[in-house]
A protein has these predicted regions:
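Short glycine-rich or small-residue beta-strand-to-loop segments that form or flank ligand, phosphate
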Residues: 85-91, 231-234, 410, 549
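Short Gly/Thr/Asp-enriched flexible loops that form oxyanion-binding sites at enzyme active sites
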Residues: 99-107, 150-157, 307-327, 363
Length: 575
């Protein structure tokens, strides 16, 4: 069936509601928009769905959500998981409550119990809840930090981590089999509740989650001692972090927490920001304004589903607030945990630090200094959860901390996804420790540079929308894969890791060895002088990402080298 035939069916079929038909009929004559909405089925990737909200097969709407859920239901039934049930959470985005309800009722119509949160909750609490309730799976409706027009649908398995092999491929296969809406089941909410299939969860789960967060604190006595002296500014960016972040800080004893009022309440339109991303300086404009008014020590922002944390801290020498990348804040927390656990005798002899292949190489130096294993995984926090499961099954390592450059980390194993709530808590504890020692967070970061090396990382993202964009991204990857360079700028290419082919090719001797990681469309260039760069298309957005890493003799030298490497790599890639 052509895209136009599918469009006409959606406009006329009684299965679709009148608002959907009205939205689509208004597009008559706009063939480009119709084609974009119907040229494909919104792809259910290895993590789930993500797309623009709207009518059409290539959009996030109740019909595509039901279709994906039917595929998930079929797989759960094949695994005899109906009675274990599925936990469901959602964020503050437009249509998130509706999509979560549609998912629950589709599962209920298939005889599967659901445990849906009564109102919005952070993604990591969903991960925790899957484990706590003994569910077979979990669903969270979120598009993380994407622009307001997006929403998404992420699937978790019974260990509380996002789906990984074999479940991801098996669920994908089941979703692909649902080719017609006549295959999709649903039921009335009142009937589902009466049948004991639809359950609502809330405060009791919040309390259990909060207790697990507080267990990760290493020195609550330092927090209490510095509670009156440290000033924290926080913004949830209109998302789910507001209540849990404030609660954990209050229960630990922090007294001076200032919340950005304009961004305090949940709002899927994100009226104060164009892009609710704590990686973006613009997202901090209101928070930094408040920080200057109250003379804050630390400024924090969580994204809409509260799994990523952005940070600014004051440099007392200049009086300016300095932005911390995810690598920087992650290293501060990691080094603090390792140092303090070693000091109090709780650092396990078989401890492991986990990071992604595009996260700072400073982690390697810190892990070596504290005698813990450094394990690298592909991008995506599902691989962190998978590693924790491997550790437990094999009794090999004990997870201590995990971080990724994209502003996510996890302390503890109560959840199996990145958690901005625990990241806020731990970073504020680090700040309290710094304050008790007469230094700032920025001073502590400088100390890490001086001790382990002046590591610097960067990221460039190209957005290429539509069919043409997807083809351009594929063409770029093919060219780089098939014609690897011997040099990138002044750097020699020592080795090329191609994770799609599972090969690491030594560019001098020609030796080929396996990468040891799952298949993924990622190219990683090992360069001379401890530099590196990596290229990967996004799995959820029409983007291709370029990552860079260098180490210099001081901060200025590393910044200079990073700029040179960035320019050289983008030139090579044909930017």
């Amino acid at each position: 069936m052509s895209y136009m035939d599918t469009y006409k069916k959606w406009c006329t079929d009684n299965y679709f509601d009148e608002d959907t038909k009205k939205e689509l009929l208004a597009l008559q004559g706009n063939d480009a928009e119709i084609e974009d909405r119907f040229y494909r089925q919104l792809e259910f990737g290895t993590g789930g769905l993500r797309g623009v909200i709207g009518a059409g097969t290539n959009r996030m709407n109740i019909y595509t959500v039901r279709q994906a859920t039917q595929g998930l239901a079929n797989y759960i039934i094949s695994q005899n998981g109906q009675d274990k049930g599925v936990a469901i959470a959602y964020d503050s985005r437009i249509m998130s409550p509706e999509f979560s309800d549609e998912a629950a009722l589709c599962l209920n119509a298939n005889g599967i119990k659901t445990y849906r949160f009564e109102s919005l909750r952070p993604t990591p609490e969903l991960s925790f809840s899957v484990r706590e309730l003994g569910c077979i799976a979990g669903i969270v409706i979120t598009a993380s930090h994407n622009p307001r027009e997006y929403n998404g649908y992420k699937v978790y398995w019974e260990d509380g981590a996002q789906i990984t092999p074999p479940h991801d491929k098996n669920i994908l296969a089941e979703v692909a089999k649902v080719t017609d809406f006549s295959q999709v089941k649903t039921m009335m909410k009142s009937e589902a509740e009466a049948a004991g299939l639809y359950h609502t969860i809330g405060k009791e789960m919040d309390d259990r989650y909060m207790e697990e967060l507080k267990k990760q604190s290493i020195h609550p006595e330092i927090i209490k001692a510095m509670a009156k002296d440290i000033k924290i500014v926080y913004t949830p960016l209109h998302g789910t972090g507001n209540l849990p972040v404030r609660r954990v800080l209050k229960e630990l004893g922090f007294e001076n927490v200032y919340v950005v009022k304009e961004q305090e309440l949940p709002d899927g339109n994100f009226p104060t920001v164009s892009y609710p991303n704590p990686e973006s300086p613009k997202a901090f404009e209101l928070a930094l304004k408040l920080a200057k008014e109250v003379d804050a020590d630390i400024v924090l922002a969580t994204d809409p589903d509260a799994d990523r944390l952005g940070v600014y801290a004051k440099d007392t020498k200049t009086g300016e607030y300095v932005s911390f990348t995810g690598n920087m804040s992650g290293m501060l927390i990691a080094e603090y945990i390792l140092r303090e656990k070693k000091a109090n005798g709780t650092l396990p002899a078989n401890g492991a630090l986990v990071e992604t292949i595009v996260t700072t190489d400073m982690a390697k130096a810190i892990a070596k200094a504290y005698g813990v294993k450094l394990i690298e995984v592909l991008t995506g926090f599902k691989y962190f959860g998978e590693q924790i499961k491997f550790f437990e099954q094999q009794n090999s390592y004990e997870y201590v901390f995990g971080l990724e450059e994209s502003y996510g980390c996890l302390a503890g194993t109560y959840a199996r996804d990145k958690d901005a709530c625990v990241a806020v808590m731990m970073l504020c504890e680090v700040a309290a420790w710094c304050k008790s020692n007469g230094i700032t967070l920025w001073d502590a970061m400088v100390s890490l540079y001086e001790t382990y090396g002046y590591y610097k990382e960067g990221l460039e993202t190209m957005t290429l929308k539509g069919m043409d964009g997807a083809e351009k991204i594929q063409s770029m990857m093919n060219e780089m894969r098939n014609n690897p360079p011997k040099k990138i700028g002044v750097w020699d290419v020592l080795a090329l890791r191609d994770y799609k082919k599972d090969t690491r090719t030594d560019m001098t001797g020609g030796e080929v060895t396996p990468t040891g990681l799952p298949e993924s469309n990622v190219l990683y260039y090992e360069l001379s002088n401890h530099a590196w760069c990596c290229v990967r298309p996004s799995g959820t957005e029409p983007k291709i990402k370029f990552y860079f890493g260098v180490v210099g003799t001081d901060i200025k030298d590393s910044e200079k080298k990073l700029d040179e490497l960035r320019n050289a790599m983008l030139t090579y890639a044909g930017e």
